[in-house]
């Protein structure tokens, strides 16, 4: 522990003084920070021991338990009575740092007395005072005045024994890199200055006597610490888990085609199956040798899954450390499916996936069936606002940091510029390329037909001609959700109409994949086809903020379009109301939804497939079937079809949860069915009824209609030509789906001749006079007077 212990009173204080990251012990002032502030600080820390000072703080007992269960190491308290109370409610005494005789007795992990004078507000600790504090705690009895320094990596593996002097320590703190003193050259040794193996300094610690330093570093370059090009001065590390991680990380980037490891990374289903297989074999192994062998196999495949998803052993250990700190734990029972049970008779209906059935006459039941999930806007905005402010303030730097935090990808630049490198199209098959080309062609054809390019001219009075003409929105930002999903359809549904409308700059934004830091080749292909100038490699609220306000490499756009999760939606709503952004959006958004109207003649397999194609989107999707005069046998057949098809789907667990809160609403007439549909205003409306086309005229509110038995929603989602970016959550009552006009604005103009002024001038002056706007009135009066159109003495 260092001689000075920084005390923080704000979430972002550590970012302002990054050299304080070098302290392994941090204290948060509980009187100035809320529980949520502390949890956020812990979440953003870099592995330091974090304690909370409770002097003058007011926390409920439950709040303190939450803090101790989520990364807070100890509580600094002044009262023996309060300490006794905390022990009584279950806090281990080792987690309490109690004030005795003017010093806090710290005993978690190491025994240490912390004098009250050592607790210094972070705001008062400059780089100079922090450095001087470290130097003041160092001791040496060596004749050359050097300090023995043990260098370890972030996994506490010893890299080597070196020496430091006060100058090298000062430089190391200032630059936050590994800098030592070379005895052989008698000079400052900047590690990696010639070899490129630069070290990032993570923390500095003094041993219990203050006569030895420990530098915790992240080794860069080739990973070699020793001049003999080995990982440490004691040779290379044993392979172990960290060696396996390093090997798999290299294989992820360079594994030859056809290799088993390459196959594992490219086939997530195979990797999942192997993990389950090896876990089962481990449970069946009996002797020590077999158990060790099977466990090693399981570790290999588990590590492959970690690497494939950008998760490190450091991430796993961080979770283990947090679990170790928990003082209240789960019961620990296994999930029921993993417990041995006596066989029980399984009834045919057990676990069946069925929709609720309600009558349209039961108003309370109908209201419950059509109620959409509540969106907690205020709570989401509290999380989104700091992200937006960070991007506004720090630009590209914030984008890179937030992408690393939320997407697990460390980028060098947050933007991919056109023309896009050919390697970004690797993996795009000819079959999919043809499918995308067909979809783009159809969407372009339909949206080009919508294009309003001619000027509308109307002579409202003799000599008064009013005109209206379109102009493309100059710069548009198109958000394409990504990460584990591949959504080229969204890219083309937004990009094609923007291209048709003639937008001068089209910017895509999509989060990069954890596996390689790229967006999918399908999205890159669409971006090149529609002329997108760049792809912002970011997702969530940070991507929306970057496009709305602009950064060093992301141009500010005039309108943002595209679907996303609740954070994306909240960010879009924020920027459209911020005059600093001057940015509009396409529409508000909620979970995806479908309403199907069917009758006795409908094919139950078709109806079931339409319901399930929506249910697989997510557990909060809305699936409603409105049945017109359905028989009991028809309802049963529908339920059976839903269950049978659902059980064949890979996302059956999601479907099951969605269908559990989905309903069949029984109506007695088509009129009643369409009245219910119009009240709900669905995103997707599917008509599986006789003479379906005759009923389109009865639809007042819907995002898009799918007419007839052979028109599944999927066609509109991908290739028919209509747009699949549609209003949800009932906004179809006020909004249209994305169309060509979405990317246009319309300007009006008027030309008034002297003849025209004679016809409308008196009306203009009369209205202006009533409104008390004399300057408005004079603008007409002066002109008419000079034209001799006013009678003598006109006032």
From Swiss-Prot:
GO cellular component terms listed in the entry, alphabetical order: cytosol
Cofactor: Zn(2+)
Superkingdom in the source lineage: Eukaryota
EC number from the UniProt entry: 3.5.4.19, 3.6.1.31, 1.1.1.23
GO biological process: L-histidine biosynthetic process
Region (Phosphoribosyl-ATP pyrophosphohydrolase): 226-308
InterPro entries xref list: Ald_DH/histidinol_DH, HisE, Histidine_synth_trifunct, Histidinol_DH_CS, Hstdl_DH, PRib-ATP_PPHydrolase-like, PRib_AMP_CycHydrolase_dom, PRib_AMP_CycHydrolase_sf
Gene Ontology MF terms: ATP binding; histidinol dehydrogenase activity; metal ion binding; NAD binding; phosphoribosyl-AMP cyclohydrolase activity; phosphoribosyl-ATP diphosphatase activity
Family matches, as HAMAP family: HisD
Database matches in PANTHER family: HISTIDINE BIOSYNTHESIS TRIFUNCTIONAL PROTEIN (PTHR21256:SF2), HISTIDINOL DEHYDROGENASE HDH (PTHR21256)
NCBIfam families membership: hisD, histidine_hisI
Descriptive protein name: Histidine biosynthesis trifunctional protein
Organism of origin: Kluyveromyces lactis (strain ATCC 8585 / CBS 2359 / DSM 70799 / NBRC 1267 / NRRL Y-1140 / WM37) (Yeast)
Gene name linked to the record: HIS4
């Amino acid at each position: 522990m260092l001689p000075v212990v920084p005390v923080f009173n704000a979430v972002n204080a550590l970012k302002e003084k990054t050299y304080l990251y070098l302290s392994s012990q941090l204290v948060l002032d509980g009187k100035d920070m809320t529980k949520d502030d502390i949890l956020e600080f812990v979440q953003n820390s870099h592995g330091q021991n974090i304690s909370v000072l409770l002097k003058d703080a007011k926390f409920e007992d439950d709040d303190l338990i939450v803090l101790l269960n989520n990364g807070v190491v100890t509580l600094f308290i002044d009262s023996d009575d309060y300490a006794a109370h905390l022990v009584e409610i279950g806090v281990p005494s080792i987690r309490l740092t109690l004030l005795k005789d003017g010093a806090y007795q710290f005993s978690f992990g190491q025994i240490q007395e912390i004098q009250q004078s050592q607790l210094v507000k972070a705001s008062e600790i400059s780089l100079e005072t922090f450095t001087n504090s470290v130097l003041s705690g160092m001791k040496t009895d060596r004749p050359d005045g050097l300090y023995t320094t043990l260098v370890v990596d972030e996994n506490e593996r010893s890299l080597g024994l070196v020496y430091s002097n006060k100058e090298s320590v000062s430089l190391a703190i200032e630059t936050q890199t590994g800098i030592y003193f070379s005895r052989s050259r008698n000079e400052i040794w900047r590690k990696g200055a010639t070899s490129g193996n630069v070290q990032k300094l993570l923390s500095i610690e003094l041993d219990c006597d203050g006569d030895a330093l420990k530098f915790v570093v992240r080794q860069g370059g080739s990973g070699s610490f020793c001049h003999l090009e080995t990982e440490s001065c004691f040779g290379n590390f044993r392979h172990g888990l960290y060696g396996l991680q390093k090997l798999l990380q290299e294989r992820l980037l360079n594994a030859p085609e056809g290799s088993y490891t390459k196959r594992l990374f490219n086939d997530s289903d195979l990797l999942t199956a192997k993990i389950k297989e090896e876990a089962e074999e481990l449970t069946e192994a009996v002797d020590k040798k077999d158990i060790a062998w099977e466990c090693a196999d399981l570790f290999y495949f588990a590590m492959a899954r970690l690497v494939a998803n950008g998760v490190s052993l450091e991430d796993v250990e961080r979770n283990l450390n947090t679990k170790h700190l928990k003082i209240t734990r789960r019961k620990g029972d296994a999930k029921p499916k993993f417990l041995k049970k006596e066989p029980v008779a399984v009834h045919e209906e057990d676990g069946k996936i069925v929709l609720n059935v309600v009558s349209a006459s039961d108003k309370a039941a109908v209201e419950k069936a059509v109620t959409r999930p509540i969106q907690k806007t205020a709570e989401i905005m509290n999380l989104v606002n700091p992200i937006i402010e960070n991007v506004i303030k720090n630009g590209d730097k914030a984008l890179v940091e937030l992408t690393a935090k939320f997407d697990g990808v460390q980028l060098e630049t947050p933007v991919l510029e056109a023309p896009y490198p050919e390697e970004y199209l690797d993996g795009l098959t000819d079959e999919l390329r043809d499918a995308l080309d067909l979809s783009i062609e159809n969407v372009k054809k339909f949206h080009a037909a919508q294009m309003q390019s001619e000027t509308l001219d109307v002579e409202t009075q003799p000599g008064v001609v009013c005109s209206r003409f379109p102009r493309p929105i100059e710069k548009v930002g198109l958000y394409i959700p990504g990460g584990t999903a591949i959504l080229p359809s969204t890219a083309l549904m937004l990009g094609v109409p923007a291209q048709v409308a003639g937008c001068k700059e089209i910017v895509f934004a999509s989060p990069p994949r954890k596996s390689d830091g790229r967006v999918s080749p399908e999205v890159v292909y669409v971006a090149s086809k529609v002329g997108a100038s760049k792809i912002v490699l970011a997702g969530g609220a940070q991507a929306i903020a970057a496009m709305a306000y602009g950064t060093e490499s992301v141009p500010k756009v005039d309108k943002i379009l595209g679907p996303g999760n609740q954070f994306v939606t909240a960010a879009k709503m924020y920027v459209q109301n911020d005059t600093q952004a001057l940015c509009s959006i396409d529409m508000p958004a909620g979970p995806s939804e479908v309403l199907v109207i069917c009758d006795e003649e409908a094919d139950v397999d078709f109806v079931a497939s339409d319901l399930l194609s929506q249910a697989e989107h997510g557990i909060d999707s809305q699936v409603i079937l409105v049945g017109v005069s359905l028989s009991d046998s028809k309802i049963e057949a529908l339920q059976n079809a839903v269950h049978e098809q659902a059980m064949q789907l890979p996302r059956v667990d999601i479907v099951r949860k969605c269908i559990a809160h989905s309903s069949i609403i029984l109506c007695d007439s088509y009129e009643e069915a369409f009245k219910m549909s119009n009240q709900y205003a669905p995103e997707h409306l599917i008509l599986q009824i006789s003479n379906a086309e005759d009923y389109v005229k009865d639809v007042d509110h819907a995002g898009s209609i799918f007419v007839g038995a052979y028109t599944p929603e999927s066609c509109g989602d991908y290739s028919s030509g209509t747009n699949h970016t549609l209003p949800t959550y009932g906004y179809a009552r006020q909004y249209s789906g994305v169309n060509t006009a979405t990317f246009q604005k319309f300007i009006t103009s008027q030309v008034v001749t002297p003849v025209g002024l004679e016809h409308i001038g008196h009306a203009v002056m009369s209205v202006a006079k009533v409104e008390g706007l004399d300057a408005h009135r004079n603008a007409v009066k002066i002109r008419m007077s000079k034209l001799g159109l006013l009678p003598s003495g006109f006032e």
